[in-house]
């Protein structure tokens, strides 16, 4: 059985395309194209299920048409509408270019060297020019932290921990400090 910590979300299947079972795929990470891994993992009814990729072709920088093995009709493809798509962490770590997308870090905890625990990275916001980690604090409040290498001190993949050193004044961190 595939566990949540063994995968990370890379996108979403939208609606079927055509009559032969192709799916429109909106992705935030093109790792499936950069790494030798012939399957994607879908979250179906709370269970991570692998599906082999028969073929795919890009439509833009963030969309592709994907054909999965055994999904040969529009009717079968419809079952995948709005299904979240994940990629195995072990294969992402093998990327030849050494580049991991920011989305790889969703689920990691984040701490600041001066202020300690910030929270958990729950999302990556790419809606603006500056990519942001959306970090959920213990109290449920969200922090927006710039996803910039210059602020990252260390990434511990085993502990799923990102240590950052954020410039003073970047965030309102007074609320995080324990008195």
Curated annotation (Swiss-Prot):
Q: Where in the cell is it found?
A: Cytoplasm
Instruction: Identify the keywords attached in UniProt to this record, alphabetized.
Output: Chaperone, Cytoplasm, Ribosome biogenesis, rRNA processing
Record domain PRC barrel: where: 97-170
Enumerate the InterPro entries for this protein: PRC_barrel-like_sf (IPR011033), PRC_RimM (IPR056792), RimM (IPR011961), RimM_N (IPR002676), RimM_N_sf (IPR036976), Transl_B-barrel_sf (IPR009000)
What is its biological role?
An accessory protein needed during the final step in the assembly of 30S ribosomal subunit, possibly for assembly of the head region. Essential for efficient processing of 16S rRNA. May be needed both before and after RbfA during the maturation of 16S rRNA. It has affinity for free ribosomal 30S subunits but not for 70S ribosomes.
The family annotation for this protein states:
Belongs to the RimM family.
Q: Which NCBIfam families match?
A: 16S_RimM (TIGR02273)
Protein name per UniProt: Ribosome maturation factor RimM
> Gene for this protein?
rimM
